[in-house]
């Protein structure tokens, strides 16, 4: 494993590969921008609100009462100013407050006399929103790399946007290989259930990719089968191809020979991290001067998820214009028990978290196991050449337990 890239270096290289293979941003109308990612900061184009707006139904008054009614202001209209003390206009919630207004009297706290004049007592609190109260013109409200949510679409509309410059979500394909895999029913007779085909697409969606349909496979565990499946995914327009299994270089491991025949270039040819050995990330030329990414995930389930965390998560962050990952910026957790190191490799150890934030190593965390992963909040990072003791504070890579949580 002397050629392996250190874990932090692999994360950085994967981010750069995602950034460098991403297409140019596109402008989409607000109705189509949901679930994409901002390619530039969302900056207000006007004060928000752009003009003073009434917070209540009532009377916009000038001076002391009683007040003479000179008109009505509804939302959407631009009223003339109140020029004289003793004048007022009826005003609706959301309507523009006339210039010259000194107070607004709530309708339920007013009386209209027989002579048509309005009396009442304004509250001490101002009953309208001032321009710029929510945001001033030119203020940055969301940075580039932010996921576009329904709420952000609404904010953009309120700020005067008709379209947003976004990075589209990458299209991903998952290819499962392994003659020993069974896609349905109980394991037995030398065959095991495919645990990656159902879960990897779900991880990818939570990390910001679009995956149409289930994983493809289990595919034929031959060189021809690998060439055919990878070529088909590339030609269908996949931006990211995740394969499972076959990442070793043994006589029955066909991924590396297939990638060589297809003309790929390695970004990371395994990383010095355990579990997760071996993993890879490569670039694959595609039609139209396009380049897609190929992530080779180990066949053991927990190792595959470590490969997702190490290579796919940062690659997608780079693609989507999110900031480069900084392992030093990871959340810090205090360990409730010791975790042994893994020699020269970084150890990503599954942990759960107590309500007080203490992280506890989980049992059932062998490379082929899923029980610990199903309970985990993330991976504690144990640096090479060290053991962690109870009470130590270490970085943690959180798992994206809910959509967009990786943002």
Model-based region annotation:
Residues 2, 17, 41, 57-217, ...:
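Short, glycine/charged-enriched hinge/interface segments at domain edges or termini
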Residues 12-23, 38-39, 43, 133, ...:
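Generic secondary-structure signature for well-ordered alpha-helical cores
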Residues 34-47, 78-90, 136, 281-286, ...:
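Short, hydrophobic/aliphatic alpha-helical segments
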Residues 2-9, 25-28, 32, 46, ...:
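Conserved active-site and cofactor/substrate-binding residues in soluble primary-metabolism enzymes
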Residues 1-68, 322-343, 348:
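Short, low-complexity N-terminal leaders and the immediately following helix N-cap/first helix
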Residues 1-7, 166-297, 301-307, 318:
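Helix-rich terminal scaffold detector
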Residues 24-26, 30-31, 53, 258-407:
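Flexible glycine/proline-rich
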């Amino acid at each position: 494993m002397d050629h392996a890239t250190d874990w932090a270096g692999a994360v950085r290289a994967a981010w750069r590969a995602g950034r460098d293979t991403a297409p140019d941003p596109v402008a989409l109308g607000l109705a189509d921008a949901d679930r994409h990612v901002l390619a530039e900061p969302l900056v207000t184009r006007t004060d928000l609100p752009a003009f003073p707006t009434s917070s209540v139904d009532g009377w916009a008054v000038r001076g002391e009462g009683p007040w003479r009614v000179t008109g009505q202001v509804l939302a959407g209209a631009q009223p003339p100013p109140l020029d004289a003390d003793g004048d007022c206009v009826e005003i609706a919630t959301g309507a523009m407050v006339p210039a010259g207004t000194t107070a607004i009297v709530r309708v339920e706290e007013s009386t209209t006399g027989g002579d048509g004049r309005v009396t009442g007592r304004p509250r001490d609190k101002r009953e309208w929103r001032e321009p710029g109260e929510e945001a001033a013109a030119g203020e940055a409200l969301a940075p580039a790399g932010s996921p576009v949510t329904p709420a952000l679409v609404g904010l953009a509309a309120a700020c005067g946007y008709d379209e947003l410059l976004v990075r589209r979500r990458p299209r991903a394909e998952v290819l499962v290989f392994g003659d020993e895999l069974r896609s349905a029913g109980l394991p037995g007779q030398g065959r095991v259930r495919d645990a990656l085909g159902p879960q990897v697409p779900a991880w990818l969606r939570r990390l910001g990719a679009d995956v149409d349909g289930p994983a493809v496979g289990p595919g034929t565990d031959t060189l021809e089968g690998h060439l055919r499946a990878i070529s088909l995914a590339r030609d269908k327009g996949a931006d990211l191809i995740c394969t499972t299994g076959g990442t070793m270089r043994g006589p029955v491991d066909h991924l590396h020979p297939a990638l060589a025949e297809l003309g790929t270039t390695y970004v990371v040819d395994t990383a010095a991290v355990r579990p997760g050995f071996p993993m890879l990330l490569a670039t694959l030329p595609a039609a139209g001067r396009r380049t897609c990414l190929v992530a080779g995930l180990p066949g053991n389930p927990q190792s595959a998820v470590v490969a997702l965390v190490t290579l796919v998560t940062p690659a997608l962050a780079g693609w989507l214009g999110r900031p480069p990952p900084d392992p030093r910026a990871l959340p810090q957790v205090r360990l409730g028990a010791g975790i042994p190191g893994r020699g020269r490799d970084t150890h990503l150890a599954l942990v759960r978290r107590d309500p007080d934030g203490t992280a506890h190593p989980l049992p059932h965390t062998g490379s082929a196991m899923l029980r610990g992963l199903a309970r985990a909040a993330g991976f504690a990072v144990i640096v090479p050449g060290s053991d962690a003791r109870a009470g130590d504070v270490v970085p943690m890579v959180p798992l994206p337990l809910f959509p967009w949580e990786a943002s």
